[in-house]
Swiss-Prot record:
This is Kynurenine 3-monooxygenase. Catalyzes the hydroxylation of L-kynurenine (L-Kyn) to form 3-hydroxy-L-kynurenine (L-3OHKyn). Required for synthesis of quinolinic acid. Belongs to the aromatic-ring hydroxylase family. KMO subfamily. Keywords: FAD, Flavoprotein, Membrane, Mitochondrion, Mitochondrion outer membrane, Monooxygenase, NADP, Oxidoreductase, Pyridine nucleotide biosynthesis. It comes from Debaryomyces hansenii (strain ATCC 36239 / CBS 767 / BCRC 21394 / JCM 1990 / NBRC 0083 / IGC 2968). Its main location: mitochondrion. The keyword Hydrolase does not apply. Its cofactor is FAD. It is an enzyme of class 1 (oxidoreductase). The gene is BNA4. One of its GO terms (molecular function) is NAD(P)H oxidase H2O2-forming activity.
């Protein structure tokens, strides 16, 4: 490897990571007139012909994500939303494969929106290509220097692997630097060397395997199953989900503890038998050949949570954002929405502080911490709801009462169901939503106890009446 140091000084903002959050952060700063440079470890996707990477779990874009897209560029947001598929609720598939039950998400027909991760990332990159933002692919972050200095600008040093025959070291200086390079953030690793940062990382005992349902080529619809639902096959310990794509296919994901997938060893026959028994209708739609290929060739993905704090360095020149600061499991559909909301919150602080970025970085850490801790916990808790509770009689009863109070008692009781607050009310911070939910849960518990007591008393009265009749014979 040849090593030739090249120093390029760019006054403005340097952003590491050209994923969804990194791209939208770059567009947001550029819209405010900052000089922006974006760096990405991977090659330019336009020049890559191999298969997309492991992270193809479809995204569910909801109100928080849409608000940020519109904040950055309302016309761009409209163009993105032309490619989503609205999902008005969950469709629960039973074990027999013959019964489906729809469970609405919103009170008044609101929807979350399915969109392909790769499409959205590529679209944002295309927006960047048509802007004044500088983009450098094949840049691996090696060092982050001069963060504590008031006289010097933060310096990012990369290994540039874009040349076919050799790699070179390149350094760039900026007024401000931002890490948006995901859960395994190298930026965060370098940042914590120069400050006291609390970091927790937890792997969840859960794996995911990507599967797919092909388009329907014979019927009137290009979709085999209803595209306007998030399909769930809940089986308590494990589950299968499927979200529609524009071409008529469905991106499907099998989630299970590692012990389940590892129990099959290398035997695709065991996996096929397992799948055929637990998801019979999905098995017919996917086909044995594709399932066998997926088991034998698709990598298993790990799920982990990362939480760091504070998100900024002491002098307010560096910040981590998105998964680099708060990676979460995907079970509430809020990972990208939360990351996008990070951007809007930061931009609004910059507006409030008249363009003072350092002060905005400092305020961001304080303002955002409780919300991010809240949604990380909610995301993990929601796995139990998706895999088990959605078929529980008492859960469904509580859900009906919750929705009824939300629909008819919002004015009188200020009642808003939890899912509505998280997915459809981006004006309510996550931390405020959980406080409202705690109050409402106490009321629901009282209603549940009262109902159960009523059933018991009614049953006891009927039994006593029956006994009285028998004794009088």
């Amino acid at each position: 490897m040849a090593s030739a140091k090249e120093d390029n000084k760019h006054q403005g903002v340097g952003i590491v990571g050209a994923g969804l959050v990194g791209c939208l952060t770059a567009l947001a700063f550029a819209a405010k007139g900052f000089s922006v440079t974006l760096f990405e470890l991977r090659p330019d996707p336009k020049k890559v012909t191999n298969e997309k990477n492991l992270r193809s779990i479809n995204l569910a874009v909801s109100d928080r994500g849409i608000r940020t897209l519109k904040y950055v560029d309302s016309e761009m947001a409209d163009r993105v939303l032309e490619h989503v598929i609205p999902m008005t609720g969950r469709m629960i598939h039973d074990l027999s494969g013959t019964k489906q039950e729809s469970q609405a998400y919103g009170l008044f027909g609101e929807s979350i929106n399915s969109i392909d991760r790769s499409f959205l990332n590529d679209y944002l990159l295309d927006e960047i290509r048509h802007s004044d933002i500088n983009v450098h692919f094949n840049h691996k972050l090696i060092r982050l220097d001069d963060l504590s200095s008031e006289e010097k600008s933060p310096k990012l040093t990369f290994l540039d692997t874009s040349e076919s025959n050799e790699s070179t070291m390149k350094s760039y200086e900026f007024d401000y630097v931002i890490g948006a390079d995901g859960a395994h953030s190298q930026f965060r690793y370098q940042l914590q060397k120069s400050m006291r940062m609390n970091i927790s990382q937890e792997y969840i005992d859960m794996q995911y395997l990507e599967l797919s349902i092909p388009p329907n080529t014979t019927g009137d619809s290009k979709f085999h199953i209803d595209p306007n639902h998030l399909h769930i096959w809940p089986r308590h310990e494990f589950m299968l989900i499927a979200l529609a794509n524009e071409d008529g296919s469905f991106t499907s994901t099998f989630f299970s503890p590692w012990s389940v997938i590892e129990s099959f060893g290398t035997s695709s026959d065991k996996f096929i038998d397992f799948f055929k028994y637990n998801f019979p209708d999905a098995f017919k739609l996917m086909g044995e050949k594709k399932l066998r290929y997926a088991f034998e060739n698709q990598p298993r993905g790990s799920l982990m949570q990362v939480n760091a704090y504070p998100y900024h360095n002491p002098n307010g020149r560096a910040l981590i954002i998105g998964d680099a600061a708060h990676s979460m499991v995907p079970f509430y559909g809020q990972g990208m929405n939360c990351g996008f909301e990070d951007i809007r919150v930061l931009m609004e602080l910059i507006d409030k502080n008249n363009g003072e970025v350092s002060e905005s970085f400092r305020q961001y850490s304080v303002l955002r911490a409780e919300d991010l801790q809240t949604i990380s916990k909610l995301a993990l808790d929601n796995y139990h709801e998706m895999s088990s509770k959605v078929t529980n009689v008492w859960y469904l009863f509580r859900k009906k009462i919750d929705n009824m109070l939300g629909r008819y008692g919002n004015g009188l009781f200020q009642w808003i169901p939890m899912y509505t607050m998280i997915s459809f009310r981006g004006d309510i911070p996550y931390s405020k939503a959980i406080k409202i939910e705690k109050r409402q849960t106490k009321i629901l518990n009282a209603i549940e106890v009262g109902t159960l007591t009523g059933f018991i008393l009614f049953g006891a009265a009927k039994l006593a009446q029956h006994y009285h009749k028998l004794s009088n014979k």
